[in-house]
Amino acid sequence: MIKKFDKKDEESGIGSNPFQHLEKSAVLQEARLFNETPINPRRCLHILTKILYLLNQGEHFGTMEATEAFFAMTRLFQSNDQTLRRMCYLTIKEMANISEDVIIVTSSLTKDMTGKEDVYRGPAIRALCRITDATMLQGIERYMKQAIVDKIPSVSSSALVSSLNMTKISYDVVKRWINEAQEAASSDNIMVQYHALGLLYNLKKNDRLAVSKMLNKYTKSGVKSPFAYCMLIRIASRLLEESEEGHNSPLFDFIESCLRNKHEMVIYEAASAIIHLPNCTARELAPAVSVLQLFCSSPKPALRYAAVRTLNKVAMKHPSAVTACNLDLENLITDSNRSIATLAITTLLKTGSESSVDRLMKQISTFVSEISDEFKVVVVQAISALCQKYPRKHSVMMTFLSNMLRDDGGFEYKRAIVDCIISIIEENPDSKESGLAHMCEFIEDCEHTVLATKILHLLGKEGPKTPTPSKYIRFIFNRVVLENEAVRAAAVSALAKFGAQNESLLPSVLVLLQRCMMDSDDEVRDRATFYFNVLKQQQLALNAAYIFNGLTVSVFGMEKALHQYTLEPSEKPFDMKTVPLATVPFMDQKTDLAPMATKQPEKAVPVRQDIFQEQLAVIPEFKNLGPLFKSSEPVQLTEAETEYFVRCIKHVFPNHFVFQFDCTNTLNDQLLEKVTVQMEPSEAYEVLHYVPAPSLTYNQPGICYTLVSLPDDDPTAVSCTFSCTMKFVVRDCDPQTGVPDDEGYSDEYVLEDLELSLSDHIQKVLKPNFGASWEEVGDAYEKEETFALTTTKTLEEAVNNIIKFLGMQPCERSDKVPENKNSHVLYLSGVFRGGHDALVRSRLALADGVTMQVTVRSQDETPADVILASVG
């Protein structure tokens, strides 16, 4: 029985780690005891334990000192003490990679491996395989084959697991032991059968047909080991995911049959596999959910936990499938295990009806203070999902969340609550004032700088739009007086937004900013001075450019461009259009599966587009194309099961497109060389250059590029269809060795057509204050037209189609159409290729289809013409 130590014991050192203050040099000095005769097993055991402890704590051993200790340890093989011998095996495995000449123990290990002492044989095999390299493997091959089929289960299991590890060193040699592995797979011992099956799968996993045959054999004949059943289920589910047969396959029938197995672990594995299969319908989930429902009433806490955790996952995608379990889940709310109770309540929050929300919230409040922060975050995530499902219940949720915010808790927990309240404010305009009031109360006593700055940003964004914005000024200015530099700077920015949007508050804000100009911190002073001078001009366009919208460029890209500018001094001022735009974060794509409280990077890191910019810049043909404007999502140009897998990423530059083709050769008997994708445009686009992929070996992806110039004479030609053909030189090769023939021959493969559309020329850019941005751009290049969308039946459908077609960013949450409305205004913003801001205001009216009045404003005439021409 483990003794439980209280805090006093810890402080006095009683019961603390006996190896806590070990010094490597002292332990290595003690290791010299190994050379003494007679050998003292007890003392040697203690020293070996110390060495293993240091190694596992990450202590660095130099090669010389490790080798010296290793050689001294080899003398311990002269002792017949069983415990000492097995400790030697463990130490050999740990020191194999840091000592030199470890092969000197090969003969001792081989002797133990083939000896009569069964207790030595298994550990000796594991240690021997750890020090064996590819050149020595054939020397012990005969012993390994014998050990795999040995009657002693521990020996057979050791040989099988070691063989599995040896496949990384010499796959071809281990593959010759497949007959022995198949013999071991028919063993009566559950662990031997499991390990044998694992080795067989590892040897055959690259051959889909062989895996299917193996699965077919063992699913029909059956296995005795529950562990082996679990492995078969996992292999079957992996094959099901890769195949198109889906739930009509015999593999699915096998997994479903395992729900009736006598072993609980097999039943759970089968249920879990069914639930995680893609595109599973509620009807197909039903048997798995029924089994999990039975587990909910199990006397075993582990089974109850597994069941409710899995049902929680099901509820994220198929809440209706879990509704039948609601009664069982309600019984688990009072479970003595708080983890089970938390998962039960969060599952009920996902599946419950609107009428049950109040009751569930009361039940949560009774025990929420007793659970860990990790589970509190899970509860908050469930509440967030419930808010989206039942927006009218926001007041109940908001009250509950504000109470949780007052409780003690760590940063991740508090951030989850703040994120949840922000999402409620954004989704429910009616909740804005109460939500902002809770946020103001929280920052009065907030110890987390990140959260304080986030809330101040929210107040600056939403506060000025409320009926009485003046009430937030006091809370914001308190932060300037009481907080650290980062929070003070954020408070100054928030104050400026109030002054920019509310004329009545402007004089007061200017006075407060003047006070901030005396701050001790440079950043706070600079911000206050800058905003003070901008606000004094009282120009809406200036406010929009420098207070509301801010910079829309990539921080990493700007840092790099500025650094380059300082390295090459020029009389020309720095041009912001040379900096790549920042891509819009996919906030609306959050799912319940992704935790809300994920760690954010503390410094600017390169995003996907910045990485592409660096990769393309090193290719000589692309050096003078200018800044990378946009990179598209990958477009698949082949079917999933074809000989070659090709997908395309479209990189947009001011006057060119670079098409990046990611190609994978799925044929193991071919080596492809000089791979290019030839493109034939339907319009006036011109192909300038091909950059080939030098070679494509089996299953190793390669990249080739095609450079295309845009038509000079027609800037409105934004749409084009390219016919694509992959051309290459084929060299046949041996599938086993991968060695290609000397001679090759030319071949080609026709790909799907590739489309260019308007959305490829526009980068999404979020404008926090659309009205101010609209005035900032001005009406110099304003175009307007009215269209009839006869095939569109709802405003929601019209909004989604417009956003998708134009590829622009919705602003002011105008992508959400209020219920029971016959008219709506959609605001979109973006930047057209070349760096020109483009704004679209689309007035929609529903009557026998949808009538749409589109107004476009831009800094240049071309984007306005292009957008209207494309919509028409």
Curated annotation (Swiss-Prot):
Start-end of each HEAT repeat: 64-101, 283-320, 321-355, 356-392, 395-430, 467-504
Subunit structure: Oligomeric complex.
Gene: copg2
InterPro entries, A to Z: ARM-like, ARM-type_fold, Clathrin/coatomer_adapt-like_N, Clathrin_app_Ig-like_sf, Coatomer/calthrin_app_sub_C, Coatomer_g_Cpla, Coatomer_gsu, Coatomer_gsu_app_Ig-like_dom
GO terms, biological process: endoplasmic reticulum to Golgi vesicle-mediated transport; intra-Golgi vesicle-mediated transport; intracellular protein transport; organelle transport along microtubule; protein secretion
Protein name: Coatomer subunit gamma-2
Compartments (UniProt record): Cytoplasm; Golgi apparatus membrane; Cytoplasmic vesicle, COPI-coated vesicle membrane
Family under the similarity heading: Belongs to the COPG family.
